Swiss-Prot record:
Source superkingdom: Eukaryota
UniProt name for this protein: Potassium channel toxin alpha-KTx 3.11
Keyword annotations: Disulfide bond, Ion channel impairing toxin, Neurotoxin, Potassium channel impairing toxin, Secreted, Toxin, Voltage-gated potassium channel impairing toxin
Function as written in the Swiss-Prot or TrEMBL entry: Blocks the voltage-gated potassium channel Kv1.3/KCNA3 (IC(50)=7.2 nM). Correnti and colleagues have also shown that this toxin inhibits Kv1.1/KCNA1, which is different from Abdel-Mottaleb and colleagues conclusions.
Entries under PROSITE patterns matching the protein: SCORP_SHORT_TOXIN
Pfam (any one): Toxin_2
Keyword Magnesium in record: no
Organism: Odontobuthus doriae
Tissue: Expressed by the venom gland.
Signal peptide interval: none
Extra remark beyond the main annotation: Negative results: has no activity on Kv1.1/KCNA1, Kv1.2/KCNA2, Kv1.4/KCNA4, Kv1.5/ KCNA5, Kv1.6/KCNA6, Shaker/Sh and human Kv11.1/KCNH2.
Length: 38
């Protein structure tokens, strides 16, 4: 995935930030959202 600066505690928190970044969905890894490119 693509690392972002969005802090998270769970993967559901990453869905919207990744959409906003033009990507599909994300996982929370090491406290940061990692998004999946389209």
């Amino acid at each position: 995935g693509v690392p972002t600066d969005v802090k998270c505690r769970g993967s559901p928190q990453c869905i919207q930030p990744c959409k906003d970044a033009g990507m599909r969905f994300g996982k929370c890894m090491n406290g940061k959202c990692h998004c999946t490119p389209k």
